[in-house]
Amino acid sequence: MAAAEPAVPALPGGGGAGAGAPSGTVPVLFCFSVFARPAAVPHGAGYELLIQKFLSLYGDQIDMHRKFVVQLFAEEWGQYVDLPKGFAVSERCKVRLVPLQIQLTTLGNLTPSSTVFFCCDMQERFRPAIKYFGDIISVGQRLLQGARILGIPVIVTEQYPKGLGSTVQEIDLTGVKLVLPKTKFSMVLPEVEAALAEIPGVRSVVLFGVETHVCIQQTALELVGRGIEVHIVADATSSRSMMDRMFALERLARTGIIVTTSEAVLLQLVADKDHPKFKEIQNLIKASAPESGLLSKV
């Protein structure tokens, strides 16, 4: 037998519907995970106010990097249903906040109109420490050239440039949308989110740079949590330790992130020999990416 849904308890101080609630408010049971807490909301409260109340009740337990849906317990059906469009609280009810499941099987389709390139922390001070750094610079430059040819926006970050230096000179930043200093490991900063919001129809991010197990990994996980499909370019990302790099890529692949190569990305973006930019991309990839040993350690 299915467990009964919790009844909406009366708020302290009374017995009838709405008893104990301040005048002009309605008692609502807010359910999240295994918890259920009653609270009063204004009569006519809609989606935004319900979200605010969930955050005030459970803020420290809600992973803000995930997407959620609010559901209403429907007596008619005996179960929760997605909150109806235009819903407004008019009587005591039960609502719950449910995380949307991340789709682990992704097709990985890339189109120039729905893709942004993220170049992460390719800075001078990392040169002596990062394995195969010269090779990932070469591949990163190839990707940025491809982005310019195809009109794909590029966002670049630099980790604490005051101490770690600027992006290496071999990387041509001509035409990039944003170059941003940071101290946070992830590239997902408010300025980056604002820049993404200005680009219509963004579905995919092509991510490369350093370090694979730190800034690349944390950026990828945050983006996936926001519903963006992530492609990590294996021949354009590295770490100081190949073990750290290998296990980071394995972990990321298990979460549905696509681990790919620079040539695969560029050819997927043109998709057809008859694409008007195919010849330029073909010239770009005529020289194969360096056989550095990176791909044998994915």
From Swiss-Prot:
- Fetch the SUPFAM superfamilies from UniProt: Isochorismatase-like hydrolases
Q: Which residues carry this modification: N6-succinyllysine?
A: 279
Q: Could you name the Gene Ontology cellular component terms for this entry?
A: cytoplasm
Positions modified as Phosphotyrosine? 160
**Classification via Pfam families:** Isochorismatase
InterPro entries from the UniProt entry? Isochorismatase-like_dom, Isochorismatase-like_sf, Isochorismatase_domain
- Keywords in UniProt for this one? Phosphoprotein
Family from the record: Belongs to the isochorismatase family.
Which PANTHER family has this protein been placed in? HYDROLASE, ISOCHORISMATASE DOMAIN-CONTAINING PROTEIN 1
Q: Report the protein name in the record.
A: Isochorismatase domain-containing protein 1
**Organism per entry:** Bos taurus (Bovine)
